[in-house]
Amino acid sequence: MVDKILLNIDNAKPSFEESALPYVPYNLKLRAGECIIVETGSMELSTALADLCSGIVKLDEGSVKFEGMEWSSLNEPRLSALRGRIGRIFQQGGWVDMYPVAINILMPMLHHSSSAIDKLTKQALTLCRIFGLPGLPMDTPRHMMPVDLHRAACVRALLGNPDLILLEHPFEGFSEDLLFPLFEMLNTAQNKGAGVICFTQQFSLWNYYRERVTHWMRLQEKGLTLENQ
């Protein structure tokens, strides 16, 4: 399992006009079951690199492959199907405010996969309880408490057992009672072969999870660098 490369960013230089990332080549390999922690002081750079991993950013050079397929070579419906294998916590929310949070949680998987709604709903309810929600929230995002909306974001990111999990600053500004349910679920996901990339402003926030961390990296103006921890 550990030899399977899930995500391969190979000398990828993002388009200067379309990305907030510094205009330098990026290299990263994530194998099944691995976890990479990326430290950066810029939330904007975190989102931009997560977009690069998801095949959203146009490249001037290099390639980004997910599960062996190069994003730039894919068209619909294969493109949407592959993005359905990615779970993500967005640091700016990524909620559609006209819909209840429950619909926001289920909608990405319903759009990107052929999973039955009753199966997804059952899994979503289980995840809600794990993260401290009594059930699927029926309020709209603007009417949710920030901490409960963050719990819902964790549920959405893990729904459908994604192969790649991208977490943009999941702990900053939230209480520690969210740490351990997420650590537990990430540990389970890695054991099943998922790859995890987590963005943080401080490596120290991940000390409790360091035994499952494969690489520590830093994202700066000069690009991605490997760090020793």
Regions found by a protein language model. Give the residues of each.
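Hydrophobic anchor residue at the start of the ABC signature
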Residues: 154-155
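ABC ATPase NBD coupling module
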Residues: 71-87
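Conserved ABC ATPase "signature" region
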Residues: 119-136
